Amino acid sequence: MKKMETAIAILVNGENRSAKLDATVADLLRELGLDSGRVAIERNLEILPRPQWSETRVEPGDRYEIVQFVGGG
């Protein structure tokens, strides 16, 4: 019997990571512990608009650059 995969390989900010099968980009942010209100996401060299985060599935081999905004003086 063949074992079903439950995780997929992706790249986040240049580091190899895994994501749950069928995860959305919003799920990925939660898994990484990031505040979705303070980040911008590039997926496969294209900016991913915030309204699409909960609709966009993480796919094997996706490359993400996630930039966090930090306030300060």
Q: How would you name each of these model-derived features?
A:
Residues 1-72:
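Ubiquitin-like/PB1-type beta-grasp interaction modules and other compact soluble beta-rich domains
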